[in-house]
Amino acid sequence: MSIKLLDCTLRDGAYINKAEFGKPSMRSIISKLQDAHVEIIECGWLKDFDYIEGTTYFHIPSDAEPYIIHKSADIIYSAMIDWDRYDTDNLPVYDGKSIDAIRVVFPYGRQNEALEIGRKIRDKGYKVLFQAANTLAYSNEDLVKLADLMNEFLPVSLSVVDTFGAMYFDDLNRIIRIIDDKLDKRVELGLHAHNNQQLAFALCIRFIEELEDRRDIIVDSTLSGMGRGAGNATTELVAGYINRCKCGNYDMNSIMDAIDMYISGFQERFTWGYSTQYFISGMYQCHVNNIAYLSTNHRTNARDMRNIIESLSVDERRRYDYDLLENKYLENQNRIVDDEETINNLKELINKRKVMLIAPGKSTITESDMLRSFIDKENPFIIEVNAINKLYTCDYVFFTNNVRYEYARDSYPRTFASLKKILLSNIKTEGAEDELVVNFNLVIKRGWEHFDNAVILALRLLNKLNAKDVYLAGFDGFKTSYNESYADDSLPTLNPDNKWDELNDEIKGMYKELYESVKGSMNIEFLTESIFEIK
């Protein structure tokens, strides 16, 4: 019985870098995997659009030919298609020069359609491999029927897919024992694991241990686990395990060279791998795109993310509907409170006074002498925004999300206890004695991805409070390194995908829109330098 390694870095990694690996990387990664004796190399996807050089979204197999140097007869070169997203009429007859095999991935309930696609592919001379996405959704009876269908077709392989990274050992054991018992031994059984619960490598080991003496098997992996969300089982770990424990013959130097030369560069520019958010995806068997949407667009903390995902039905969790998700997010945030008395109290407090907003930017440190002089001279009503700044004495701290509220409470307990706070109702609906709660929907305006920027929300609130003169400090703009922008180096970042330029551009747009809307009723001046200032 054989154990084969299928490296799908160039295919699964395409989720991370939009398939833009570049010609040198593609050639060298394939070459290094060849040198490492990896049995199956997945070169990318087949897609229904024209090929762009240097990407792994191929239109036809010959598009991959320039990247396969010294094609080896001992290696299968594959590409993947979604069962319903590639027109097989475009697929030419197999010529042996590039792609040898095509993997067809299909969702639960679409087995018959996938087999029909597979027949068309095999009729053109290619090997056919199947991927049963979200295999965890299959009942025992479903698994028997799946095996029966595969026995009629006899593909090269059928792979179990832990789509949401939700499997534990008992789940894997249930699935593979039923399939192994019913599946023709001529069909190899594969595993594609995701690392949402840090179990991808462990599941691969269990898979190998369970089946190695009974049938030929295939294990999917990627270099450094490169793949969407929490990523995949890592090629270097799986290859190392097979070498040490199963008499494998993988050249680890070639694998590590591929990582050092190319994957490390992608790791500097892109993010993948285990995180709390993707653990939640695994916990609830939730599509990773839902997690990415909440993280990217709303910087949702783990507690709120769980509440939102729990509010979805099982079926809704497994697909992604961004409009539905946006509505669920707003439902979760928009906890209605009676804030009429709070608004009136705040209006009285700032009546005819200049208001100074102290945002978290580093300029509040570098320009502290100037800012203190302004405070001494003008005696403004001071509101700190989403962070405590111990250089200044404020009248209130304005918090817009639970992450910053809890960080301030836990990091500066004595200062936090001494300060009065203004909270949005997405944090809590009933404030403590020193907390005023304002309705979340009073200050948000939809239509922007990052509509909950704290300074923008503070300015909207001040406009509702009839503030006339507002002075901004620390609204600097975001730099490109983690927390380089903040006065407090440990302040939790709220931009998980590190797209700082895009975030800055959108805040500029939001500020410009707000500035134009309040012109004539509320004057805004910048005390410290800011990329958002309109001059």
Label the predicted regions.
Residues M1-E340:
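Catalytic cores and adjacent flexible loops of soluble metabolic enzymes
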